[in-house]
C-alpha cells in the first residue's frame, strides 16, 4: 500500500480556515491555530444570532405598534384583541410598517379594532 502524504490536504484545510478568517484583526487572520478558534466562535455567534434576530425584530414591531396604537387611544394588548375580534388578520411586521410609513391606514385599522371592541 502506498504511503499517503497529507501536505496538499492539510494546506487546503488551512487555506479554507484562513479564508474564512479574512478581515479579522491580529493573529486571528493569519495564524491557523488562532484563526480556527475564531472561525468556530464566529459560527457559534452566527447560529445563536440567527435565532435572536427573530426575537429582536418581533420586539421592535411590538414597540412600534404599541406607540402607534397609543396615539389612537389604545394599548397594544387592547388593539391586538380588537383586531382579533374584528377578524383582521394582519401580521405584526405589516402593522409596524403601516405604523411607521402609513399612519392614516394604521389609524383606519385602529378605528375598526375600536369598533369591534364596542360590540
UniProtKB/Swiss-Prot annotation:
Annotated coiled-coil segments of the chain? none
Task: Name the domain of life this protein comes from.
Answer: Bacteria
InterPro entries annotated for this entry?
Ribosomal_bL20, RIBOSOMAL_L20_CS, Ribosomal_protein_bL20_C
User: Does the keyword section mention Ribonucleoprotein?
Assistant: yes
PROSITE patterns listed in its UniProt record: RIBOSOMAL_L20 (PS00937)
Annotated GO MF terms: rRNA binding; structural constituent of ribosome
Entry-linked CDD domains: Ribosomal_L20 (cd07026)
Q: Which keywords fit this entry according to its UniProt record? A: Ribonucleoprotein, Ribosomal protein, RNA-binding, rRNA-binding
For the keyword Cell membrane, the answer is no
Q: Biological process GO terms, please?
A: ribosomal large subunit assembly; translation
- A Pfam family reported for this protein in Swiss-Prot or TrEMBL: Ribosomal_L20
A Gene Ontology CC term for this entry?
ribonucleoprotein complex
Q: What does this protein do?
A: Binds directly to 23S ribosomal RNA and is necessary for the in vitro assembly process of the 50S ribosomal subunit. It is not involved in the protein synthesizing functions of that subunit.
Protein family = Belongs to the bacterial ribosomal protein bL20 family.
What HAMAP family does the entry give? Ribosomal_bL20
Q: Provide the protein name.
A: Large ribosomal subunit protein bL20
Give the organism, scientific name.
Answer: Nitrosospira multiformis (strain ATCC 25196 / NCIMB 11849 / C 71)
- This protein's gene is called rplT
Amino acid at each position: 500500500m502506498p504511503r499517503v502524504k497529507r501536505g496538499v490536504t492539510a494546506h487546503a484545510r488551512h487555506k479554507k480556515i484562513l479564508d474564512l478568517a479574512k478581515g479579522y484583526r491580529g493573529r486571528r487572520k493569519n495564524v491557523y491555530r488562532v484563526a480556527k478558534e475564531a472561525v468556530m466562535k464566529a459560527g457559534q455567534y452566527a447560529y445563536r444570532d440567527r435565532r435572536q434576530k427573530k426575537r429582536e425584530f418581533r420586539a421592535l414591531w411590538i414597540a412600534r405598534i404599541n406607540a402607534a396604537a397609543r396615539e389612537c387611544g389604545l394599548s397594544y394588548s387592547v388593539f391586538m384583541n380588537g383586531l382579533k375580534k374584528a377578524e383582521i388578520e394582519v401580521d405584526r411586521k405589516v402593522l409596524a410598517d403601516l405604523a411607521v410609513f402609513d399612519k392614516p391606514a394604521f389609524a383606519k385599522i385602529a378605528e375598526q379594532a375600536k369598533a369591534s371592541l364596542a360590540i
